[in-house]
Regions:
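Metal-dependent nuclease catalytic cores that hydrolyze phosphodiester bonds in DNA/RNA
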Residues: 1-111, 117-155, 315-368
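Cys/His-rich finger/ribbon microdomains and the adjacent scaffold used
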Residues: 5-25, 30, 35, 44, ...
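Intrinsically disordered, low-complexity acidic Ser/Thr-rich regulatory segments
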Residues: 26-57, 155-188, 248, 252-260
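Conserved RNase H-like, two-metal-ion catalytic cores of nucleic-acid enzymes
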Residues: 59, 63-70, 111-113, 118, ...
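Conserved DEDDh/DEDDy metal-dependent 3′-5′ exonuclease domain
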Residues: 78-83, 100, 111-116, 172-175, ...
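Two-metal-ion RNase H-like nuclease active-site motif
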Residues: 79-86, 385-395, 497
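Active-site-proximal helix-loop-helix substrate-binding element of RNase H-like nuclease domains
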Residues: 120-166, 211-215, 220-258, 498-519
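A short acidic (Asp/Glu
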Residues: 123, 222-226, 397-402, 471-480
Length: 519
């Protein structure tokens, strides 16, 4: 669809379109900005763009690792069109996929999908019972992880037993393409669907096909070794961990096959009739995620405005409605949007949570809620001088410096303003900063200067906004540089979180509700 085509569509005789086709026309027109003509479906993610070269390097390193692990040459390339390709045709539509890593031996075909994510979501995929943890993926003798859910049924933990229902609940998460563990399995299942249909059409079904997911090992710590060109050498770490973890998902994607087939048929049906459903928003939109649907700006045009229902805090738990038996059923924000509830002022009947009611009152009735007692308590906790601290970090998929893990937040800069007395903080004279001058490891220099700049000998506090980030970085620096642990721990102990003051309190919410009841 182009702007030129849309202009031509305006000249089509009136009445030629039925209602559904008019919705299509309106939908396509919405794909362009009315004033600038810009394509609203083009969404770029700056972080993903910056990581492109690193993602390519991850695939290259994964191919090297797999070739060595299986002792076999592999087909892999930085150029997508040089990768192994499978394709088939269905009702005039071409389906194809390029495979990240592929090789074929005498007995089987092995296909590897590489994702530049970490294994943490699969490491944490466990059943916890009586304080014991039972991983659902375990490493076999070939250093490959396999799903062992069914094997856990009947396992005793204390006085309890792992039941089939417990395992099934976890198993279902693997088939939710919007869950942390399911989204990558879904990608691999789509590949299997294309590969298997391609082989059927080519009458090439003589070998078994194995399907593997390859991700970065969240437990891997870089040794700090580099080659003669200064590139990191990702050999086994001191605990014997490799940079990658490999998951054999052959059985799981086999279960997925007919689900993918149903989805494919549904897509083909939609393409055939070009239907537009006006009540289609949901989890599938992946709004505000890196994988957000490119049509969000079009489909959600009526919602993306000032005072949007999407502005409610804790949206996952914000909405519910009363049932005939007097109970309340939870509603998602998308269910309300699909019912044409677009703004905060339309939603009062669905709110029961204190913080959401407060937000409604602030927006609709312009009320102001201030917890003066909480502010007084906070002010008593503040000690001068105040060191206003802000860190900047880079979470590279591939660890760059010794001791770092994949995606670890690597500090390269901090900004510090020192307020010696109330209101006494000169923008220049009381400002201190550190910025790494190159791409080498400058964490030690940053640590030493930070300790020098935050002088707590005479007391004071270190003010941050959302302390979890700064405190975690300080703990990491203390682990990297044990000789400065005492000083870094001291800074950590003096952290004051401004977010805890501004985020309200349960006592405040209770007071709001009591006030409303009196009114």
């Amino acid at each position: 669809i182009t702007e030129e085509l849309l202009k031509e569509m305006k000249d089509i005789p009136e009445g030629m379109f039925d209602e559904s086709q008019e919705r299509l026309n309106e939908f396509f027109k919405g794909m362009f900005d009315e004033e600038t003509g810009a394509d609203l479906t083009i969404i770029t993610n700056a972080q993903m763009e910056a990581f492109k070269l690193i993602f390519t390097e991850v695939e290259r390193l994964a191919a090297e690792y797999i070739s060595k692990l299986f002792n076999h040459e592999v087909i892999a390339s930085e150029n997508t069109y040089e990768q192994k390709k499978y394709e088939f045709e269905n009702f005039g539509h071409q389906f194809y996929c390029y495979l990240d890593i592929y090789f074929e031996d005498q007995d089987s075909i092995k296909i590897f999908e590489v994702k530049s994510t970490t294994s943490k979501k699969y490491d944490d995929f466990k059943i916890t019972l009586e304080g014991e943890e039972f991983p659902l993926f375990l490493k076999n003798r070939d250093n490959i992880y396999e799903y062992v859910g069914d094997e856990l049924i009947g396992t005793v933990a204390g006085k309890k037993v792992i039941t089939q229902k417990m395992v099934e609940k976890k198993h279902d998460a693997l088939f939710n393409k919007f869950s942390k563990v399911g989204k990558y399995i879904y990608d691999l299942a789509v590949e299997k669907y294309i590969v298997e249909n391609s082989r059927i059409n080519a009458n090439d079904e003589f070998k078994d096909v194995e399907y593997y997911l390859v991700v970065l090992n969240s437990e891997y710590h870089f040794s700090g070794r580099y080659d003669e060109n200064g590139k990191p050498i990702y050999d086994l770490d001191e605990n014997g961990n490799a940079l990658f973890k490999i998951y054999d998902l052959s059985d799981i994607v086999e279960e997925y096959f007919f689900k993918i087939d149903d989805e494919c048929n549904r897509i083909l049906e939609n393409l055939k009739y070009l239907t537009i459903n006006t009540h289609m928003l949901g989890e599938c939109c992946e709004y505000k995620k890196t994988t957000q649907c490119k049509f969000c700006n079009i489909c959600m045009k009526k919602v993306l405005r000032d005072g949007s229902i999407l502005e409610f805090m804790k949206k996952n738990y914000a909405f519910s409605e009363e049932t005939p038996d007097g109970k309340r059923d939870r509603l998602t924000v998308y269910e309300l949007i699909n019912r044409r509830y677009y703004t905060i002022d339309q939603c009062r009947d669905f709110l029961t949570k204190n913080d959401n009611i407060m937000q409604y009152e602030c927006y609709v009735n312009n009320k102001v809620y201030i917890d003066k007692e909480r502010i007084k308590l906070a002010l008593k906790e503040i000690r001068y001088p105040i060191f206003h601290l802000d860190f900047e970090s880079y979470n590279c998929p591939l660890p760059r410096f010794k001791g770092e893990r994949p995606y670890e937040q690597s500090l390269f800069q901090y900004s510090l303003h020192v307020e010696n007395r109330p209101g006494e903080c000169d923008l220049v004279a009381n400002h201190y900063e550190f910025l790494a001058k190159d791409h080498h490891d400058r964490r030690l220099e940053l640590t030493e200067q930070l300790i020098h700049d935050i002088d707590l000998k005479n007391g004071g506090c270190v003010m941050v906004y959302n302390k979890s980030f700064e405190k975690t970085r300080l703990h990491e620096l203390a682990a990297f540089f044990p000789k400065y642990k005492k000083e870094l721990d001291n800074i950590n102990e003096h952290v004051f979180d401004l977010l805890e003051v501004l985020n309200g309190s349960s006592a405040l919410y209770d007071d709001i509700l009591n006030t409303k009841l009196k009114e």
